[in-house]
A protein has these predicted regions:
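Small-residue-rich helix-loop
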Residues: 265-321
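Predominantly eukaryotic Lys/Arg-rich, low-complexity intrinsically disordered regions
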Residues: 311, 325-328, 344-345
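C-terminal catalytic domain of photolyase/cryptochrome flavoproteins
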Residues: 315-320, 336-339, 347-348
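Conserved catalytic or metal-liganding residues and their short signature motifs at active sites
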Residues: 1-283, 339-342, 346-354, 362-385
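Short, glycine/charged-rich beta-strand-loop motifs at protein surfaces that mediate ligand recognition
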Residues: 328-335
Length: 385
């Protein structure tokens, strides 16, 4: 064998050794890159490569619908079964990718049986981790300031995640429903209202975003909302009302009117001052929302209908006309809606004014024009150009 052949063999050996060394380095690197405890190294590499290829899908929601969907995981359900259920509800777009993700990150053994409430707007990664803790699953439930109890009932009927109806809820909060004695005493809720009817919990179902446990009953929802009222409307506020000669029932009743009138939050204390000034004089409140409450949904199917001046003194045949403060002196028999904390504080801490009248302003921004007794004629003549 000549010298050139020896040199060629040497070069080939070096190349082979280099390739083998490179393969070892690459293999070791892949092992380190994809290593996950409890996974076969080759399987880990395969899963990691697939996840890297679909990185965008992992962080992209399946859709834009914010509606919550109920997902049940039964004891013994595998990752594949769970993935199929998620795919069927359009919560993920790739069942296989979900299985690969939970296997690679060891979540497949942590997926917990239970009831979950998920959205299309969550990513696959977020859903995977959410399904490891059934105790954290809650039903979001929102009520707004200024709603009457029937509107809360309507929202219950629109929520497929709740297992009771709006009618069930009205039975535990409506007129004649049982009211916890301590709550009733604390807030000065009468046994019988001024119109001779039994009271309801109108006004005391605190408006907030609630996180409800799966399987909650109408009775339990009522208790959560009353507990929220007692949390935010403190004993100090009850005492403040008493110092002003008011029960919290009277404060909430007036605050419910202020809530419906005040579009701009900073005007709430001024509007409260108008009504308090009229009560002290005394003058009828002449509050439009009380007329709307009396009419209810009997006119156009909405709970707060448009009214005209003819409605101020023409509610013949309307069952709730005792709520109209154009027809009756003083406060209405009870609250007309759920006031927020701002409206309640406005009644407890009203602005100091000499206003007795107000009208909607002309800028369509929710603000009002206010008038004193001396400006009564100006108030009556006020019109927008």
């Amino acid at each position: 064998m000549n010298q050139s052949s020896h040199n060629l063999i040497g070069v080939l050996l070096v190349l082979i050794l280099g390739v083998l060394l490179l393969a070892c380095v690459v293999g070791a690197g892949l092992f380190v890159w994809a290593r996950q405890e409890g996974l076969n190294p080759l399987k880990a590499i395969q899963l990691r490569i697939n996840l890297e290829r679909h990185e965008d899908e992992l962080s992209r929601p399946a859709g834009s619908d914010p509606q919550y969907r109920k997902v049940e995981i039964l004891p013994g359900d595998t990752a594949s079964i769970i993935a199929s259920n998620l795919l069927a509800q359009n919560l993920i777009t790739d069942a296989g990718l979900f299985v690969d993700y939970v296997q690679y990150y060891g979540l497949d053994s942590q997926l917990e049986a239970g009831t979950y409430f998920l959205q299309q707007t969550q990513t696959l990664e977020e859903i995977a981790y959410a399904l490891t803790d059934a105790s954290a699953a809650t039903i979001p439930f929102l009520t707004l300031e200024g709603w009457r109890i029937e509107q809360i009932a309507d929202v219950i009927d629109q929520n497929p995640l709740l297992e009771f109806s709006g009618a069930d809820f009205l039975r535990v909060v409506g007129p004649g429903a049982s009211i916890p004695p301590d709550f009733k005493a604390r807030n000065g809720i009468p046994d019988v209202m001024s119109n001779g009817q039994p009271p309801s919990l109108e006004g005391f179902l605190f408006p907030a975003t609630y996180k409800l446990k799966p399987g909650i009953t109408a009775f339990e929802l009522r208790d959560e909302m009353l507990a929220a009222f007692e949390q935010y409307v403190t004993d100090a506020m009850v005492q403040q009302a008493a110092a002003q000669g008011l029960t919290m029932y009277e404060v909430v009743t007036l605050a419910s009117i202020v809530e419906r009138e005040a579009v701009v939050a900073e005007e709430a204390p001024i509007i409260a001052s108008v009504y308090l000034n009229r009560l002290r004089r005394p003058m009828r409140l002449d509050a439009d929302p009380t007329v709307q409450y009396a009419i209810g949904n009997t006119r156009d199917g909405t709970w707060w209908p448009q009214i005209t001046q003819a409605d101020y003194y023409g509610l013949s045949g309307v069952p709730n006309q005792s709520y109209s403060t154009y027809l009756n002196d003083g406060l209405p028999p009870g609250p007309i809606a759920s006031p927020g904390l701002g409206a309640i504080n406005a009644v407890l801490n009203p602005a100091v004014t000499e206003y007795f009248f107000f009208r909607a302003g002309c800028n369509n921004d929710g603000r009002h024009e206010f008038f004193t007794l001396e400006q009564q004629a100006e108030h009556a003549a006020f019109t927008c150009p």
